[in-house]
Amino acid sequence: MTDAQATVSQLWVYPVKSCAGVMVQEATLTDMGLLHDRCWMVVDAHGEMVSQRDVPQMALIQPNLRLSDVVLRAPGMLALHLALFQVQEPVKVQLWGQIMPAFDMGDVAAQWFSDFLGQTPQGKALGPLRLARFDPDHVRLSSTQWTGTVAAKNQFSDGYPYLVCSQASVEDLNARLATQGHGAVDLRRFRPNIVLSGIPAHDEDHVSRLSWQAEEGAVVLQPVKPCSRCPMPNVDPDTAAVNPLLSDVLQSYRQDRRLDGAISFGMNAIVTQGVSEEVEPLLRVGQVLNVTYQL
């Protein structure tokens, strides 16, 4: 039974993990997330992930997805063009303690990231950086603690293929900020893939399924885990300045018992119907989704 309806108001793809996102009008759903989402990841000399948590200036790297390449731009840098379907030698990379195969993207990309992200705001030298592309033959699964029997695949996301957030949740946060005399923030700080309008603030926390009819058939997304929040939302996506105010405000009302009191905002989601290696439907801004709430 459908309990309500919501409308897709925004779609976001993040080609390079921890860099800026691309707002799109339509996106292809794959069994590993939106097409091209978190395909690439910046790594240090040891192959470990580099992110805005330590290097907030990554927020200033702006991607542009085109038919055959992605173009990266950053202040003071020439544009870097990455072919969508070309890689170099295989490498091993590490993400949250998981070691996995990937492909190096070559010396030009490595030098570009090393030049722009040469050191942290604290002056700590990062050393040489490399850019890696996810190996699509590798199967990286979400935690079955939250997905149950569903084998949900990921690329370089933190752990789940989709992140869903309601527009009203951000508006509610901004209302709280305003009462304290602070300016508004936008949802880019929370890095969602699918933004919904038409449901109340944080109703995504209580949704059991989001469904709609694509041209290929019925599609079902299942929110499975609250998205726990590290300090990354404190990074201003326009300036890369860091201010802990946002975390302080979230701490006052978004401690989640399901996460032992950690801050949550938005829901990680998986596909349970209608998407496979053979079937990859489009999702468009303006699509109306059927919302079923948890009992």
Regions found by a protein language model. Give the residues of each.
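Metal-cofactor-dependent catalytic cores
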Residues: 1-295
